[in-house]
Structures are given as C-alpha cells and as structure tokens.
Amino acid sequence: MTTADVLIVGAGASGAVAARRFSDAGMSVVVLEQGDWTAPHQYPGSALEAELLAGGRWSASPNVRGWAADYPIDTTRSDLGALNFNGVGGATVLYNGHWLRMLPDDFRVRTVDGVADDWPLTYAELQTFYDAVDRQFGVSGLGGNPRYPPGADPPFPPLPIGALGTRVARAHAELGWHWWPATNAILPATACGRRPCIQQGTCGTGCTEGAKGSTDVTHWRDLVRRGVRLVTGARVQRIAVDRAGLACGAEWVDHSGAGQFQAADVVVLACNGIGTPRLLLASATTAHPDGLANSSGLVGTRLMLHPIAGVTGVFEGTDAGAWRAHNGALIHSMEFAGSDASRGFLRGATWALGSAGGPLRAAFAPDGVGAWGLAHHGHVAGRLGRTAYWTLICEDLPEAANRVVLSRTLVDSNGMPAAEVHYRRSANTEAMLAWHTERAMESLRAAGAVAVEAVTHPANGHLMGTARMGVDPARSVVDPWGRCHDVPNLVIVDGSVFVTAGSANPTSTIAALALRAADHLVRHRRDVPRAAHHGSVMPPHRRTPRPAVQTTPRTTTAAAVPTFHLTEADRRHLGRIADMLIPASPTMPAAGDVGVPGHLVDRYLAARPDLVAGLVDTLRRTAGQAVEQMDDEARRVLRHAVAGAYYLSPEVARRLRYRADPLPPVRPDTYPAYVAEGLLDQVLAR
C-alpha cells in the first residue's frame, strides 16, 4: 500500500480545485469518488425526453434518481428536500451554472445585523481566489457590477439575456431597481478546449457540449493525465485516525463490495454539507465517541439550505423558442440582497431570472394541474417560450436545530447509515419568502406580464454550514483554513465550512475557499503533523448506530428498458382518455393521431420506468370510466402519461417549434443592446 501525500474524498467542485493545487505543487494525490464517470452522450441533452428524464433517473434528488452510487437521504423531518449528484464532477454535473460571489457584507452578518457570526475572513481575503476559480471554470459575465468591489470581472463576455431578460431589465431600469447581466460558469465561445453554449436549455441534466463548467470537464480529465489517481466506485465508510489522533487514511468499499484502505499524510473531505458530517459522525472512535472532529458538538448542526421561492410571469408576443436559453440565469438582481428592518425580517435574497421551461412544464402550469380538453392547446401555446421565471434565493440563518444526523433506520447499499436531515424554515425565513415573492411579482408586472404566479420549491442543493469555520475550537469545527481543530491533518473544503449562507449560489465561494485552503496547506505543509502509518488505527466506537432496517437505492442505468404490461384493452382505454385530454385543434393534432396510446407511451415509459406500475394500475381500475368520473390521483397519473407521450411526438415539436435542430452556438454580447439602450445607467449611477 502506497501512502499518498493527500487523500481527497469527493470529486466535485471543491475536491477538483484542491486536487489541482496539490498536483501543481508536486504532491501525490489520491481521490476516492463513490460515483462514476458520466459520458456526455449519456445526458438527455436535446432529446425530446429531457423533461421526463429530469423528473426520473436524471433528477437532482438521490432519492428519486436512485442510482447504485447514490446514498439515500432521509428528509421526512425536513421542510426541504436535499439535492446532490454522486459521480465525477459532483453537483456541478447537474447544477445550472449560475455563478455568483458572496457580497462583502455576507461575511460580516454579526457586525451588520447582530445575528449569527462573522466569518474569520473577509471578501478581500478571498478575492484573488475568486478570480482564480473564475478562470478555472470559464466564467462568463459583465464586469463592473456595483454591488461588488472593483475587480470582480469575469474572464469571458456575457451570454445573451434574450427578449425576456431585456423586458425585465427595462422594468428594473424604470423601477430604479438593481439588475445585472448574469454571471454563469458557461462558455460563450470556444475556449479551454471546450465548445460554446448552444442554448439547449437543459443545463440541469448535464451539458452535452462541455460548455458548462462542470469539473468532470474543467478539471478531472486533465488531472488524471497529470498523475492524480482518481478511484471511482469507492464508497468511503470511515476516516481512520491513529492512536495520536491524527488522520491516517480512509476505509472504503469498492465496486465488488470488498473493503479497502488508502493511507495518506493529509485527508481532505469534499463531500458536501450533508456527506461530510455524515462521514465524520460515522467515523466515531473511542477517543471521538460523538464523531470525528466533533469535540465542539457542532458537526452536522447549523445546516443551511437556501430556501427558494419562485415567481412566473406570462407574457404576450415572445418567440416560442425563447425557453431554450441557457439555464444558469439571464439576469440577476441584488436590489434586496441586504437587510432592511422595515421589511420585518433580517437578511435578504438574490434573484435569478430564467425561462420557465419546456412543453411539459407549460402543460401543467401554474398549479400542477394545467388545462385539458379544448383549452389545452391554447394554454400551452400561451406559455411556451412566453414565461419568465424569477428564482428567489433566500438567506437562511444558521440554527442549531437544523442539522444532519445518522439515521437509525436507513442505510446505503453497503450498510453505512444514511444521513437524516432535520430542517425547519424559521419565521424569519417565511417572512422573507413572502416579501420577496410580492416584490418579484411587482417586477414582472412592471415588465408587462399578463399573469404572475407564485411557485413553491420543495428542495435545494445548496448544502452549507454543518462543519463551520472559526478561531475558537469550542464554537467551530475547522479553523479559517479548513483544518479541523481536533484533527489538524484533516481538512474540510466543501460548503460544510460556511458560517453564514449569504444569498448567492454557493459554488463560486465553495471553490474559492477550497483553493484558499489547499494553497495554505501547500505553503505550510512542513508544519502539518503526519500520522505514524506503522502504528495502529483506532477502532470504531461501538455506539455508532447500526440501522435495523436496510434500504438499498434503486439501480438505474441509461440502457435499462422496462417490461411493459399494457394490454390491448389498456391501450384502447388510454386512447379514449388521451383524445379527451388533448383533442385536435385547427393547428394541432389530437393525442391519438400522433400515436400516444401506441409507440409514444412506450417511449414515455422507457424514459420513466418508475411510472409503469402506477400507470398500469390506474388504467385497470378506471376501465370504462370517463375522466370526470375518476379520482384526483387517477386524473393526475393519466394526464402526465398522455402529455408526457404527446410532447415526444416530432410532429408536435415541429408545430410548436420547441425543438428546432440544429442549434447554432451563442454569439456573446461583446457590446450588448442593453448597454446601447442605457438600461444599466441607473444601476451604475446609484
């Protein structure tokens, strides 16, 4: 067994940035990643099934996705679900790429608002690291945003903001509210060996072009060529420590289920704000009975998830193809990102504008029910490409009751306790969500929306705060450089170390902190104590919970084709229902005319094998019933099946113009029309 200079657990954003810095310094690096590589051709991309797959095996929720590499997350005691991705690239594979830095005051919440704590570092100390990771990820945007100190200038020009972005920008110029062309980790032109964005609108299910800055593309391929050893299918069970209390490596299980051990002088955790506390708590020893690095009792506590609200505005007269813009953000607003006591709550939210999605989302908007029968075609045509969507990212404060613990009833497929999330939105958060929803409605009405609708977000992937940094070991888990107070050669570089959440998407800050921590370790490596690898390893603590009920995630592969059980009677019944739900119009065919009860429902079920049993059961228990005679659940299942199959029809796609291939690359706005129109003048003049 070879001892690595550094062992990194997790191959997402923070692990990649840290690995690059260690490799640049000539250190030997081993990375253990429990997922696998995903080839770009496996992503849904421009396939008509993309929206369906995003709700199934390409969901950002591990509990829905259920891949063999995933670990389940118990969120039954949480107001929000938790999103992640297990594989090379981590969450960057499925994130939308909106790339914002935290604001200077986000690091000084105690000083500014008298709540939570200040960070043990400032924006100024992080700025050079922000700049460096912007270059690594290929960030596009427009410099000069007055909400930031000078120097926050992206290395590539901004992506187009489109007709919808321009409408809302004009409204904010008239209202006197801040707006700015969005900053995204998405390339507008060929660079860094990557192709430019082609505006597929499917960033959230993997970028087929490599334009989005996911670390499987931006970092890991190059790092492997340079000698970094990246082991996939490696599920880490425990961080090992020696008798002196120093980290000496990790125990892990390979693809076959065999136990392995990797020794290292330094261990770096890059497992996200749920995975890292889970691993620390599972690594309890007799010397660390409450979990590794947990003498403060803070491991897993103060979880922050960025509760999100959404507001849709429906407009008239825009092009149906407008929904296909990149999914990062078109524009963003920080008008209300700071605190104002007159609002009745502390802290604020950042707004990010995008389109409201494709035909399936249009069909079921605004309430998850949609419109059916003769009204269906007008309903979809009035929304597809004609809706703008404000995502309101609210800052939640760190609260001890919001936490991650080890489940006593749920394990992953190797028997390791799952993470159990306890999270409740506070009164402050609820007031913030309601207030920002009203302001976002005002914004879209000012932009000319003929209808505005509030949307609930049930989950988020911004996982922060569960191993917070600080200078006092009694009140923090790691020091300002990410080194654990209790285990000085154990370093945490993911969102766990956040002291407060800010309201910016956290990936930029996570990456900058990871680079800062890795750079500090490289510069001071001689001062880092090392374990005596010839000595004995501390045994696990016997009180580490072992769940009584083992639950294994479903295994999903892109090639899996379910066995269908639709009889001819089932298909006849579905055909009758289909033409009631989506009849013909002067411009659109009926569902039955394009093959919904035949080959299209087969394509639908191939994309969503998890829905086969429910559809078969519903068809058989409603046989002979008209739609109006069915219960709500039956109507829901059948509407989804009919619409899901209908919008897979190439003829329907052609008539609605929601899939016009081939797509040309975007043309970056080197001198955008909104500059010529003066839409930024009031922002810059304030």
Which residues are covered by each model-predicted region?
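Conserved redox-cofactor binding core of oxidoreductases
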Residues: 55, 59, 70-77, 98, ...
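Mature-region segments of soluble proteins
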Residues: 553-560, 573-576, 588-591, 595-606, ...
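Mid-to-C-terminal "cap/lid" subdomains and adjacent gly/pro-rich loops that border
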Residues: 36, 68-69, 266, 270-386, ...
